[in-house]
């Protein structure tokens, strides 16, 4: 829509100053009279939300901007702000700070006044417990900051009346919506969307990243339906409101120089199996497509009962080249959460995604975190008696490979190496998350939007949430590992064209002088071609790693899930790993996520989905990523049906996720050579989309080298 285009141009004007939310926090910290950490933080949160002068764009319909965090400070004030805030360290991604889907459904149902009433009720229950009472007061103060921010925006609308370029009727309407969102319960679709967006901008101002908007087509639908039926809203205007909101995610790039990953989840199914797709699902899809920016990161839950028209609508948007929505298999994700979690059925069916593809129990568990587990590294320890080829890292000594007489024996020793790696990974995880004084790292505002925290008077990371935290171990290189094991089995134990000792020497030499052996390894069966000789190792890989990590728990008793996702880390991970038995050279990227190694899946997309769907992804509660690249012509009328049928087959066989780039190798190569001509080219990277020309060369080449299907 025209208003979206105009708003995007406004957003691009960065203005003066630099990103300094610490300035507003410091105002609260320096004036607080409280001695406990929670209320000190709350005072800083209040000034962060309430003190900045609101930034309202001329083409705004839904307000809430992070431009008001751009401040032009003199050197002394800037130093004072930094030093003041440094005395109050914050949690980070590794210690559960963000990657969270808030409980927007509850706040829309009861409004900010209802949240205040719940806090008051809880204060009466916990009045004799000082720490809980203080935390409830901190939540109250933080929530007051949100209310003040909404009212400041309403007042600023009045101040802008008569200013050039501002529509007075629109300003009055926005002000009315902000006041209702601040002082009552949202009554209209616009007011509900306004409240959600203002809360989201508050999270960004706090410094939180990858804060999801959750199942927006579900919690906004009652407002949409009621307004539509009463005649005060049209579907067209609802779509414009959504676009007006989503395009502001682009502000993050303007203000901070990088893209935020704001996941929105649409579709899905109910416990009775019926589809949750509604009219708003289509409008969200259309709005995101019209924005044509790297965010939001749209995810579509696809079940066996999802209408074909909805899947087709998803493919139409993917076909524009923006790389989303990512398509999620609802049945597999629900089964995985049921199998690995401790969650009630109702909450499982209301799951959404945070960050890239991570499954999350919406609004009822602490923020997500994950880490990287580089599985191919353990070949070095296996072949070199527990020492990496460069001598920089160590596993366990499982003996000389010359003593291994069978594939089964080799697998047993390889499993021992991986199991030790899992143990060390969890040891590091626990050390990072073992907080000596967690009460000094409280999050009173975020805790307001998690079920259980208000009632218990506890922080989201200190037992307040309904469920414990979950951690994801992103296991790298399934394609590299499977191809390597198949190559070992074929060349060493089946055809006996080499020995494990020769293979070890070849890998240490990075195959220099062993070119013939490398050629034999490259000729072995490869993952992604529907060949059980190699695919059986994918089945083993998923099962073994999930069972190993399942032995451990988070500090608060939650589960350790595996993720078969890379988020471009396959490139950096490969950079620190020597040559592998599949013929991969040292420092080359590992295979990406759940995808076959690029260029080795030579039998077409059907063979790929048949291979990738063989493991039991009900063991992968975090999620997987299968990257596929199809030519733009595959998305034309009359051809999308074939692609939809392929996806249905993949999901029916147990595949968990698929995301698609609709582009060609020629376009990507030309963009690398002439970036100035492709500033708006959006591609799917891994679990997110980005402007292609802003990516570093290694990531650009990784996307370029993905197998072109169709």
Predicted feature locations:
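Extended non-globular scaffold/tether segments
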Residues: 137-149
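Conserved catalytic cores of very large enzyme subunits
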Residues: 1-139, 163-165, 169-710
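Amphipathic alpha-helices that form helix-helix packing interfaces
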Residues: 146, 150-153, 174, 488
């Amino acid at each position: 829509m025209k208003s979206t285009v105009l708003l995007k141009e406004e957003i691009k004007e960065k203005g003066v100053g630099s990103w300094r939310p610490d300035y507003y926090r410091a105002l609260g910290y320096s004036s607080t009279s409280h001695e406990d950490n929670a209320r000190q933080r709350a005072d800083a949160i209040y000034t962060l939300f309430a003190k900045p002068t609101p930034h309202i764009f001329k083409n705004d319909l839904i307000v809430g901007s992070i431009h008001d965090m751009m401040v032009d400070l003199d050197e002394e004030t800037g130093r004072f702000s930094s030093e003041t805030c440094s005395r109050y360290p914050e949690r980070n991604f590794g210690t559960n700070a963000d990657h969270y889907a808030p409980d927007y459904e509850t706040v829309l149902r009861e409004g900010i006044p209802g949240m205040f009433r719940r806090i008051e009720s809880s204060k009466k229950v916990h009045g004799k417990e000082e720490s809980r009472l203080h935390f409830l007061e901190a939540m109250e103060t933080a929530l007051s900051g949100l209310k003040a921010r909404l009212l400041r925006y309403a007042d600023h609308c009045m101040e802008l009346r008569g200013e050039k370029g501002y529509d007075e009727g629109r300003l009055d309407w926005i002000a009315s919506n902000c006041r209702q969102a601040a002082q009552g319960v949202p009554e209209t679709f616009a007011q509900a969307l306004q409240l959600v967006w203002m809360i989201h901008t508050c999270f960004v101002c706090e410094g939180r990243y990858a804060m999801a908007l959750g199942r927006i087509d579900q919690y906004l639908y009652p407002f949409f339906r009621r307004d539509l039926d009463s005649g005060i809203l049209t579907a067209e205007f609802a779509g414009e409101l959504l676009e007006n909101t989503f395009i502001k995610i682009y502000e993050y790039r303007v203000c901070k120089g990088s893209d935020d990953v704001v996941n929105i989840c649409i579709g899905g199914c109910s416990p009775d199996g019926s589809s949750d797709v509604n009219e708003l699902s289509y409008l969200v899809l259309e709005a995101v497509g019209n924005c044509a920016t790297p965010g939001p990161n749209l995810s579509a839950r696809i079940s066996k009962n999802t209408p074909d028209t909805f899947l087709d609508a998803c493919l139409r948007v993917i076909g524009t080249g923006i790389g989303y929505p990512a398509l999620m298999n609802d049945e597999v994700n629900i089964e995985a959460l049921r199998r690995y979690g401790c969650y009630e059925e109702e909450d499982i069916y209301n799951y959404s995604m945070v960050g890239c593809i991570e499954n999350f129990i919406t609004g009822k568990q602490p923020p997500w975190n994950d880490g990287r587990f580089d599985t191919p590294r353990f070949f070095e320890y296996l072949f070199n008696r527990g020492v990496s080829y460069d001598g920089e890292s160590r596993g366990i000594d499982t003996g000389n490979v010359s003593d291994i007489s069978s594939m089964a024996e080799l697998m047993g020793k390889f499993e021992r190496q991986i199991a030790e790696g899992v143990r060390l990974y969890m040891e590091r995880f626990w050390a990072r998350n073992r907080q000596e004084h967690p009460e000094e790292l409280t999050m009173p505002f975020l805790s307001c939007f998690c079920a259980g925290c208000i009632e218990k008077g506890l922080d989201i990371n200190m037992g307040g949430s309904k469920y414990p935290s979950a951690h994801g171990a992103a296991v790298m290189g399934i394609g590299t590992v499977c191809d390597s094991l198949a190559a070992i089995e074929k060349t060493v134990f089946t055809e006996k064209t080499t020995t494990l000792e020769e293979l070890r020497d070849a890998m240490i030499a990075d195959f220099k002088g062993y070119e013939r052996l490398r050629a034999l390894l490259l000729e072995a069966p490869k993952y992604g071609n529907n060949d059980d000789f190699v695919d059986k190792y994918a089945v083993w890989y998923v099962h073994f790693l999930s069972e190993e990590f399942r032995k451990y728990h988070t500090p608060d008793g939650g589960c350790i899930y595996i993720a078969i996702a890379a988020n471009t880390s396959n490139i950096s991970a490969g950079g620190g790993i020597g040559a592998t038995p599949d013929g991969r050279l040292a420092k080359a990227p590992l295979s990406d996520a759940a995808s076959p190694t690029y260029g080795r899946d030579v039998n077409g997309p059907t063979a790929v989905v048949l291979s990738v769907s063989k493991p039991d992804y009900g063991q992968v509660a975090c999620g997987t990523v299968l990257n596929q690249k199809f030519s733009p012509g595959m998305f034309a009328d009359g051809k999308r049906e074939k692609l939809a049928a392929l996806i249905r087959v993949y999901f029916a066989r147990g595949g968990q996720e698929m995301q698609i780039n609709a582009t060609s190798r020629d376009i990507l190569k030309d963009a690398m050579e002439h970036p100035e001509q492709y500033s708006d080219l959006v591609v799917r990277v891994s679990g997110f989309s980005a402007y292609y020309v802003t990516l570093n060369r290694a990531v650009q080449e990784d996307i370029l080298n993905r197998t072109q299907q169709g």
